């Protein structure tokens, strides 16, 4: 009896549901995020802007809230609420990575978001706040300071949108 050959390509470990490649991406994000935060804390005094270009400063600031310092002055409970939210998000993302491991752009996006979320969770647990230091501005108008974890979350979110647009266009 002849064995029939499958016409599909062999599945990669990511396609088989392995979390390892995606957790590796998240770990790289966490490492770069934490190393930059450690360096900034060692080099800069709190709140002192260091001009890099006419539109970009490095400045050590603490964010006790969420994005754009949302709920930063809420009295302390937000530390634990945003930590719990980050942990729940990480668990959901791990489930999605395991379930959709073969979808490279989707999983890359999720891995970036995972790394960013956990980078900020580490800050909340270790310091009670998130360390921010990237300050873009136009004259006197400053975008809220952020960090590499926030950047990874943003890039991941953009990739999710692009992946969905590509998927929808491909199904037409």
Curated annotation (Swiss-Prot):
Coiled coil: none
Protease keyword on record: yes
Pathway: Protein modification; lipoprotein biosynthesis (signal peptide cleavage)
One Gene Ontology CC term in the entry: plasma membrane
Membrane topology summary: Multi-pass membrane protein
Catalytic activity: Release of signal peptides from bacterial membrane prolipoproteins. Hydrolyzes -Xaa-Yaa-Zaa-|-(S,diacylglyceryl)Cys-, in which Xaa is hydrophobic (preferably Leu), and Yaa (Ala or Ser) and Zaa (Gly or Ala) have small, neutral side chains
GO aspect biological process, one term: proteolysis
HAMAP family attached to this UniProt entry: LspA
Protein name: Lipoprotein signal peptidase
Organism of derivation: Paraburkholderia phytofirmans (strain DSM 17436 / LMG 22146 / PsJN) (Burkholderia phytofirmans)
Phylogenetic classification of the source organism: Bacteria, Pseudomonadati, Pseudomonadota, Betaproteobacteria, Burkholderiales
Gene that this sequence comes from: lspA
